[in-house]
């Protein structure tokens, strides 16, 4: 199928200095948890996107010196020849597919905690990081400035040696160049502080030095936070931003534009809960107005129509993407081939980002279960090993895990029967996507629905059976399938069982008229009173989402939370605006409080720290702490129990108890996946469905086969002349 001619503009080549982008699709620098220490992961993840048609692939932020060490998080590094060797694996693989490779040179100032190197970071002035804990920098004198600028030059030369085509001076997200430019950080009174011209001096000099060193071989880019979105007192696009672009335009070959700062970089990597694609256009277009160089901006671009609007209206020249490239590494190729309904659209949940925020474990993706698994498991997002046997597979449950398993199995040539009691695939995601701001999460369901519909046309023996009665163990055993996958999901606890006490709460019972589970709130069938209390022991989105839904509908909402409310939303960058939203709606929170018992219309709550700080051994059967005297009663008209989830695995348990009957019914194996195995993130539920489907022919698909680990082996020196002998300097 040919692409629509109006999209031809997206495939025009773009010249950036001495290099040429083959089209306008550009993967901006983004973290994956590979850095320089996992070259297989780094090269495989970036190169599969090069295969998918992206014009350029960048590393994550890449440290130029041990003074810029982001441990506990995992960045790339280009400190020495060992890093050059490891990163060259990426550039070599990317070049095989005709794409350019870029590196983002990073010096963090006080935002680099240096937990591994224990070096002292330097900055324009001495300040404490608002992002890191107990991290201060040394104010740079003139010799410090010259030395750090040389760090950039040396790193740029190593980058060229590693095969990189594009070299960034990273000045977004409150890192060193922007710290000099921003009066929020820069309190200097010498030639590097005060006026805009002085505050810009460090950045301009650094660009000039890097360009002189490698500019004939590499395109020079800078990532610029054109507006910190705090208003006066920091960087504003039409006050300082545009003027700086005019100052630096001759020194760069391409502008990569962001907004926001390090403390709230979710203003740039906007979650779909709060921001639609293209949300940064009002700022990016201001740069395009004054620059003579190619300009790119990000905005979770997934729709080709939005992409051509950006180019034809002159907002930007290049479509910058991070999250959309993770969700679908073959997005450019699918647009080029006119396969628009095959695009795996990023849902904007920011679970990919959460892994970096947590500290750098391998990146995952809710939409694309192969993300991060390209090297270690050998998974390709568009290629599947074709089965040589004729096994049929019954999948009970068409939620995120079951529908993903069905898709992968059908792609691999199996006959699949996917069944569910609901009228639509998606499982609990159908309710979740109806919560405020989460509509785009339904793209997860839509992609699988579209692909399964297509695959059913190819394999006439496969079936999708929705709106069915619940299957019993007898139904499964007598169905006639060779293999069975149970994907019956999870539900919220009706009795208040929670992570704090691991027991039900006396009086908790969602069958009562004044108590509800989240599912009951979302399905809207049960009457909800004016005064609502949400009892929370969940650390993700459910309690604040229900609070927003109910408060918007006119209810008076109080959240009683025994855990840090919405803690995981810190990692997905949703937390600041979620808290602002609850404040706007006058939602009250009683943090560090939980419930001891419930009676009609009221609940007894207590401060979880109310048992005192002193501990004394008092013998068996007696608490070593004092009695908690903080108990008090609060009233409600309706109580929502957001205390925990449990797997709906009754069918699995019944089948497992009758395992001796499997063989006599010609069943080779029955497997449990997704939330039915254990409640988890949608991304992880999707992954388990994908994994079991990929490994369905293994001896026991329930247990994952070992993946390739990238480790430093004893006796393999990382640096030239290095060794792994234990030697003490005495």
From Swiss-Prot:
InterPro entries assigned: Aldolase_TIM, FAD/NAD-bd_sf, NADH:flavin_oxidoreductase, OxRdtase_FMN_N, TMADH/DMDH/HD_second_a-b, TMADH/DMDH_FMN-bd
Active-site positions on this chain: 175 (proton donor)
Biological source species: Methylophilus methylotrophus (Bacterium W3A1)
Name of the featured protein: Trimethylamine dehydrogenase
Residue numbers bearing the S-6-FMN cysteine modification: 31
Catalytic activity line of the entry: trimethylamine + oxidized [electron-transfer flavoprotein] + H2O + H(+) = dimethylamine + reduced [electron-transfer flavoprotein] + formaldehyde
Family note: In the N-terminal section; belongs to the NADH:flavin oxidoreductase/NADH oxidase family.
Kinase found in the keyword field: no
PANTHER family the UniProt entry points to: 2,4-DIENOYL-COA REDUCTASE, 2,4-DIENOYL-COA REDUCTASE [(2E)-ENOYL-COA-PRODUCING]
EC numbers, comma separated: 1.5.8.2
GO molecular function, one term: 4 iron, 4 sulfur cluster binding
Binding locations of substrate: 170-173
Assembly and oligomerization: Homodimer. Forms a ternary complex with the heterodimeric electron transfer flavoprotein.
């Amino acid at each position: 199928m040919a692409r629509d001619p109006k999209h031809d503009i997206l495939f025009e080549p773009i010249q950036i200095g001495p290099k040429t982008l083959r089209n306008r699709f550009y993967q901006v620098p983004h973290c994956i948890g590979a850095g320089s220490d996992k070259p297989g992961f780094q090269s495989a993840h970036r190169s599969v996107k090069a295969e998918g048609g992206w014009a350029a692939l960048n590393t994550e932020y890449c440290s130029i010196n041990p003074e810029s060490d982001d441990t506990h998080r995992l960045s790339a590094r280009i400190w020495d020849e060992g890093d050059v060797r490891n990163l060259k694996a990426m550039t070599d693989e990317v070049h095989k597919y005709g794409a350019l490779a870029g590196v983002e040179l990073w010096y963090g100032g006080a935002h680099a905690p240096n937990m591994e190197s224990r070096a002292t970071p330097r900055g324009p002035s001495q300040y404490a990081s608002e992002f890191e804990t107990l991290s201060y920098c040394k104010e740079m004198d003139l010799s410090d400035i010259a030395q750090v600028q040389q760090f950039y030059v040396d790193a740029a030369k190593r980058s060229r040696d590693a095969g990189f085509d594009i070299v960034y001076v990273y000045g977004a997200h409150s890192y060193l160049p922007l710290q000099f430019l921003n009066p929020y950080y820069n309190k200097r009174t010498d030639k590097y502080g005060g006026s805009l011209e002085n505050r810009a001096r460090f950045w301009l000099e650094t660009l000039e030095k890097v360009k002189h060193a490698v500019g004939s071989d590499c395109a020079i880019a800078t990532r610029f936070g054109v507006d910190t979105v705090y208003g006066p007192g920091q960087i504003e696009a039409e006050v300082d931003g545009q003027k700086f672009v005019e100052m630096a335009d001759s020194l760069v070959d391409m502008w990569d534009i962001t907004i926001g700062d390090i403390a709230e970089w979710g203003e740039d990597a906007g979650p779909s809960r709060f921001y639609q694609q293209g949300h940064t256009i009002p700022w990016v277009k201001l740069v395009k107005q004054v620059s003579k160089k190619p300009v790119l901006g990000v905005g979770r671009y997934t729709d080709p129509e939005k992409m051509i609007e950006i180019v034809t209206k002159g907002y930007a020249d290049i479509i910058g993407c991070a999250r959309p490239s993770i969700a679908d590494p073959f997005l450019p190729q699918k647009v080029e081939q006119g396969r628009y309904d095959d695009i795996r659209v990023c849902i904007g949940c920011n679970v990919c980002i959460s892994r970096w925020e947590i500290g750098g474990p391998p990146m995952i993706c809710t939409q694309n279960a192969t993300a991060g698994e390209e090297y270690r498991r050998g998974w390709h997002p568009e290629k599947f090993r074709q089965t040589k046997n004729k096994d049929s597979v019954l999948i009970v449950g068409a939620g995120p895990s079951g529908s993903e398993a069905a898709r992968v199995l059908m792609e691999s040539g199996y006959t699949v029967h996917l069944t569910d009691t609901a009228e639509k695939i998606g499982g609990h995601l159908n309710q979740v996507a109806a919560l405020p701001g989460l509509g785009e999460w339904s793209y997860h369901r839509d992609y699988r629905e579209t692909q399964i519909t297509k695959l059913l046309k190819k394999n006439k023996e496969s079936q999708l059976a929705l709106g069915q009665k619940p299957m019993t163990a007898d139904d499964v055993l007598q169905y006639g399938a060779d293999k069975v996958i149970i994907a019956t999901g999870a539900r919220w606890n009706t009795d208040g069982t929670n992570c704090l006490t691991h027991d039900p709460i006396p009086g908790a019972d969602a069958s009562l008229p004044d108590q509800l589970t989240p599912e009951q709130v979302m399905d809207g069938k049960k009457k909800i009173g004016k005064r609502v209390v949400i009892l929370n022991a969940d650390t993700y989105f459910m309690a604040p989402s229900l609070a927003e839904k109910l408060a918007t509908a006119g209810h008076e909402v109080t959240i009683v939370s025994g855990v840090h409310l919405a803690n995981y939303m810190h990692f997905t960058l949703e937390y600041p605006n979620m808290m602002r939203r609850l404040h706007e709606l006058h939602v009250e929170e009683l943090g560090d409080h939980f419930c001891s018992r419930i009676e009609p219309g009221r609940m007894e709550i207590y401060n979880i720290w109310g048992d005192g700080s002193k501990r004394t051994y008092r013998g068996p059967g007696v608490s070593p702490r004092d009695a908690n005297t903080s108990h008090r009663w609060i009233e409600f008209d309706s109580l929502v129990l957001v205390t925990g989830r449990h797997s709906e695995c009754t069918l699995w348990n019944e089948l497992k108890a009758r395992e001796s009957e499997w063989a006599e019914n010609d069943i080779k194996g029955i497997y449990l996946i997704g939330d039915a195995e254990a409640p988890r993130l949608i991304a992880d539920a999707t992954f388990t469905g994908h994994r079991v489907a990929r490994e369905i022919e293994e001896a026991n698909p329930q247990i994952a086969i070992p993946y390739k680990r990238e480790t430093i082996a004893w006796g393999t020196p990382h640096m030239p002349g290095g060794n792994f002998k234990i030697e003490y300097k005495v």
